[in-house]
Amino acid sequence: MDKNQITRRAFLAASTTTAVLTGCASSQKPNTAKVVPGKVSPNQKVNVACIGGGGKGLDDMMNAKKAGANIVAIADPDWNRAAEGFYKCKDAKQYKDYRVMLDEMGKDIDACTVSTPDHTHAPAAYRVMKLGKHVYCQKPLTHTIAEARLLRKVAQEAKVVTQMGNQGHCQVGVRELCEMMWSGVIGDVKEAHVWTNRPIWPQGIAAPLPAEPVPAEMDWNLWIGTAPERAYNSKYAPFNWRGWWDFGCGAIGDMACHIMDAAFWSLNLIEAETFTAQAIVSEGMTDQTPPLKSTIKIDFPARGKMGPVSVYWHDGGILPTRPADIPADQKIGDGNNGSLFIGSKGYLTAGEYGGHPRLLPDSKMADYKKPAPSIKRVSHNDPYYDWIECIQNGGKTASNFDYASPLTVVANFGNVALHAKGEPLIYDVKNGKVTNNPKLNALLTKEYRKGWELPV
């Protein structure tokens, strides 16, 4: 190994490896029959299998069902967590290992939801798409940048219908925000701020938690999936995994695909060939967990007719400085979450999902007429209807992986910047590399536990 190369786990106290996906608990050969988009009749229900059946998995399951899907199978390593989903979809076959489910039921499945902790998104979605199945994957799309690039590539090759679960992207508010921005009402935007009240789970923890007995209903080995082995503790699952590097992506990973979406879309950041990220504030980060609070500055060069812009991410209670000409009694964003765009002619703000966009100060909205709609609205303003209808009729969803992957890359690169401890890092979008500190490219991927590897 080149002496300048270090591993992600060297930062997080381990080592890295890559290989081809080989893991499957069943020896049965996976079914590879391909479901062609648009070949499921609009009058025919889409057979959906759910990877993750509790919490957000239950939400995704029931929303897919509401949109017209037929839930045929549910896989979850924690059957206590999945119990409500099992009850509400009694006819669905029940599994602990989604790989066994796909092996045994591949021919009966058209599509899958992936609603698992971040670290297992990519292996599940990868396997689903390799079988020619459509996929709805929760945000952030992946745990690492390399995984995000891989899933985009595989989705293009498989020609399947994909959707990431940043539901605000399908709603009217963010579309109105883009139309307002593109009308030029606030002029040239050189600075934007995005913030969240997350983390609402513990972070800043220096060591793994002590071992506890594994609940009888849980297969802890399956839950760990790709991550290095560690003892079970109830403070990892089912929720607080978000605050552990091995399982989650911290506050920016959890929320940027929601809150930063408005900036990413309206400022056309997807067109940037490079960008630079720097951690301005980082308090309490450890090898085990993300920081208690952070501010990350991400600089994007000019894109088409749009000039350079700096986007600031704030979490852990940090808020952007209120502009002097916005009265103190006027809300910016939703308060604890939101975005603020600072233009040469004024200000534009929006809520958590890009909703309720409005000019500031409030007086600017008194006589303002929003532009006529120019962006297509999504069926029912709903990502699940969008996904199911595109499976039946063909076409691309709003947050398909060609969009979701680059958005996830920006969010995950914020975490890479946190590990650089204040050093500005330059990212080459086309080649997927850090250009000014190559040793940090190890942080764009991760170690995979044997049996769960991906070709990244």
Can you annotate each of these PLM segments?
Residues 78, 115-120, 141-143, 148, ...:
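Short, solvent-exposed turn/loop segments enriched in Gly/Ser/Thr/Pro and often Arg
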Residues 176, 188, 193-195, 202-249, ...:
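Contiguous beta-strand/loop segments that form the cofactor/metal-binding neighborhood of enzyme cores
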Residues 100-107:
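Short amphipathic alpha-helix with an adjacent loop that forms part of the alpha/beta core around
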Residues 18-89, 168-171, 181, 263:
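N-terminal Rossmann-like dinucleotide-binding module
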Residues 117, 122-170, 184, 422:
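Beta-strand-loop-alpha-helix segment that lines the small-molecule cofactor/substrate pocket
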Residues 1-19:
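N-terminal secretory signal peptides and thylakoid transit peptides that target proteins
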Residues 93-97:
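Conserved SAM-binding strand-loop segment of SAM-dependent methyltransferases
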